[in-house]
């Protein structure tokens, strides 16, 4: 195609995207078709990748396809493996796409679809994809080192240790929140619990099958795995209806917490080939297939967005989460726009599989755009269901039905209708019956809400194939595998971080080949995130109300730290005139996270500030005037949880400010130098047989 044809295509895409965005923005008081959001998003992603992504690659970073990558230099068939770019894109996407893009947009829908949509699109183009791409580039130029090691190398040992401690603490919070979403989705859900539990022996069987029974037969084991997944969902319905079997899979939140802690420990110490690898394989199939199916379903059904563009809760008084649109919308959406967790994947893991530096934009920038598209579809799925149902599902039980309420559903319908979102008890009963659950009231965490939206889209787009309950539990399985994959991998990664830290005290604890050291570090990791998980599960306000803001703040602060590193590297490369590419999102993230952190810690508003909330409940205990919706032990739990969250938030704020000072100091020192001071691996040209090596690796995959 000649240049004029290409220009015509990009011009047409720009016009279509601008028209779609304009239609969405100018539509006031009328319900619009969800297809407008999907079209606008796709146009934005394509234009951003073609122009901004490639500008960063060619002009800002000076990506060099002739430069040897760590995967080619150290090709050992284990950690360093040059991988075909399409295969690596799948690996990278599976690793970064966890619960964030699924849950964050669902929670953000409390304020309407418009604010969330704008930030998801603007945030990913200017911040999220930029971070993923630049960190991948920086790590690739330094032999695939991890984020903490990169900070240590470029900013000094003190900053490096501080970054490592912060990374570990943030990882613990992330894992606790991820696990809590699974717990909230599976509590008193025999169908969902059975289906997810079924995947554990299935994954182990697949691992043994491919390693010992039929080595190399990937096709066979894939068919077996997919067939058994469908059987797990169908048989889950039989289990849920059985008075004998249902109680075996009907657990409280606390029981599921301890089950997940035990599972997390076992999964982290078992050989990777036995459980994690086959589960990841199953998860990748399910992720990609479901995302594609959901996108096609939206195109076929063209559902109407029933949630308003802006709700009354933009003033910060919402029941799902508290706080004003700025800064709390930005930390609530989290991974759908920008995620610090991705920096841990883009450094240390993906760089060791990158076959050519020229593919970093496709993997890093493109992979994050794909995750953002998942977030857009999650937002659509949440906004097509009745707003009354949305708020009944996501509001805390203490708000919907105070302690002692006999008819919880009637109470919830009355409370939600009082907010201006009319809903009847019959409607809530009907939806619970259609999805095969005992109740949908206060199923906080976002995952059940997303599952309801997905179920109706998939059921409708396939012409009523299977009933809604099948698709609801299919969506729950999809979300649980999405999340448990991240919990498995995250626990293992956190164990490596902790062993690095423990190695400072005792060098023997750093050895990953030592079984006692591995078991000790793994136990400490699962107990750490298990503790926060338990605190969230027993929280009378649902846990998500307090833990998700902490997760959002910590995760976005980690992104800010990663982008600070990228800005420092640009200064040390003598490319400071382009440092704005990293400094622009860094500045916004620091403003948002520090503002949110300060408000969550010290705001006198008893719906926002952790300490204010703790003091309010402590005063109730001291005076003996305990509201009917709480018990004294519940109030004591809330006091402790909020004080702990405040302490952690203050710690993360101090860390990010200190690292910002180290960044400024390092950048100023770099400006005084006449030559580049970035500590890159010396240049080596790509070998002549690089393509052959990659092709061999592709066949091995």
Describe every region a protein language model picked out.
Residues 1-14, 47-102, 284, 324, ...:
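Membrane-interface "cap" regions at the ends of multi-pass membrane proteins
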Residues 18-31, 102, 114, 172-188, ...:
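Transmembrane helix-loop junctions in multi-pass membrane proteins
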Residues 22-28, 33, 79-142, 153-157, ...:
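Membrane-interface helix-loop-helix modules in multi-pass membrane proteins
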Residues 31-50, 54, 108-138, 148, ...:
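Extracellular loop-to-transmembrane helix junctions
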Residues 35-42, 47, 53-60, 166, ...:
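Membrane-interface loop-to-helix entry segments
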Residues 54-81, 107, 117, 121, ...:
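Flexible loop linkers connecting adjacent transmembrane helices
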Residues 154-172, 366-373, 444-446, 465-475, ...:
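Loop-to-transmembrane helix boundary motifs in multi-pass membrane proteins
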Residues 298-314, 369-453, 489, 534-539:
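Extracellular/periplasmic helix-exit of transmembrane alpha-helices
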């Amino acid at each position: 195609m000649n240049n004029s044809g290409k220009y015509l295509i990009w011009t047409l895409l720009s016009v279509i995207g601008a028209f779609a965005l304009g239609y969405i923005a100018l539509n006031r008081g009328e319900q619009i078709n969800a297809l407008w959001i999907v079209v606008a998003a796709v146009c934005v992603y394509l234009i951003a990748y073609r122009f901004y992504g490639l500008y960063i690659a060619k002009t800002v970073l000076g990506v060099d396809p002739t430069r040897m990558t760590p995967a080619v230099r150290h090709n050992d068939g284990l950690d360093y493996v040059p991988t075909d770019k399409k295969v690596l894109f799948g690996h990278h996407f599976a690793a970064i796409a966890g619960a964030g893009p699924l849950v964050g947009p669902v929670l953000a829908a409390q304020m309407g679809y418009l604010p969330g949509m704008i930030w998801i699109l603007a945030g990913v183009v200017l911040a999220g994809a930029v971070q993923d791409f630049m960190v991948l580039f920086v790590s690739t130029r330094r032999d695939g080192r991890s984020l903490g090691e990169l900070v240590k190398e470029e900013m000094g040992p003190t900053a490096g240790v501080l970054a490592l401690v912060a990374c570990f603490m943030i990882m613990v919070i992330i894992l606790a929140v991820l696990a809590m979403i699974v717990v909230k989705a599976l509590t008193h859900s025999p169908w969902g619990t059975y289906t997810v539990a079924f995947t554990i022996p299935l994954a182990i069987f697949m691992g043994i099958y491919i390693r010992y029974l039929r080595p190399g037969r990937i096709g066979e084991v894939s068919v077996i795995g997919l067939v058994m997944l469908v059987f797990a969902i169908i048989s889950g319905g039989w289990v849920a209806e059985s008075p004998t079997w249902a109680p075996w899979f009907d657990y409280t939140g606390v029981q599921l917490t301890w089950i997940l802690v035990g599972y997390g420990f076992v999964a982290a110490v078992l050989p990777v080939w036995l459980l994690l690898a086959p589960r990841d394989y199953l998860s990748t199939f399910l992720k990609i297939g479901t995302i594609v199916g959901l996108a096609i379903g939206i195109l076929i059904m063209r559902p109407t967005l029933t949630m308003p563009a802006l709700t009354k809760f933009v003033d910060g008084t919402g029941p799902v989460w508290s706080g004003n649109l700025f800064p709390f919308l930005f930390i609530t959406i989290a991974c759908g726009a920008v995620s610090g967790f991705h920096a841990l994947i883009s450094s240390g893991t993906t760089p060791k599989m990158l076959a050519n530096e020229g593919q970093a934009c496709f993997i890093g920038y493109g992979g994050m755009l794909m995750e953002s598209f998942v977030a857009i579809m999650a937002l659509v799925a949440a906004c097509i269901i009745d707003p009354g149902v949305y708020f009944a599902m996501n509001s805390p039980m203490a708000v919907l039905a105070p302690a002692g309420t006999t008819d919880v559903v009637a109470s919830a319908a009355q409370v939600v209708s009082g907010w201006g979102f009319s809903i009847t008890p019959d409607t809530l009963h009907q939806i619970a019956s259609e999805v095969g659950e005992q109740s949908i009231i206060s199923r906080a965490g976002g995952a059940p809400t997303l599952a309801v939206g997905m179920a109706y889209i998939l059921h409708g787009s396939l012409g009523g194939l299977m009933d809604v309950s099948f698709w609801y539990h299919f969506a729950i399985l999809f979300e649980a595998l999405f999340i448990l994959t991240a919990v498995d991998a995250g626990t293992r990664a956190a164990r490596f971080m902790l062993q690095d830290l423990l190695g400072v005290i005792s060098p023997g604890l750093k050895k990953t080949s030592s079984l006692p050291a591995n078991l000790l570090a793994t136990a400490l990791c699962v107990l750490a995130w298990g503790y926060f998980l338990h605190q969230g599960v027993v929280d009378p306000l649902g846990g998500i109300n307090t833990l998700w803001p902490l997760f959002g703040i910590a995760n976005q602060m980690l992104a800010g730290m990663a982008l600070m590193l990228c800005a420092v590297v640009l200064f040390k490369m003598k490319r400071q005139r382009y440092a704005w590419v990293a400094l622009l999102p860094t500045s916004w993230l620091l403003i948002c996270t520090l503002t949110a952190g300060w408000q969550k810690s010290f705001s006198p508003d008893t719906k926002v500030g952790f300490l204010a909330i703790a003091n309010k409940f402590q005063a109730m205990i001291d005076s003996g005037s305990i509201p009917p919706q709480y018990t004294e032990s519940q109030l004591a739990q809330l006091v402790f949880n909020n004080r702990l969250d405040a302490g952690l938030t203050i710690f993360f704020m101090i860390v990010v400010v200190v690292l910002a000072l180290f960044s400024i100091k390092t950048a100023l020192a770099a400006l005084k130098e006449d030559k580049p001071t970035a500590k890159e691996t010396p240049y080596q040209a790509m070998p002549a047989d690089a393509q052959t090596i990659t092709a061999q690796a592709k066949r091995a995959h």
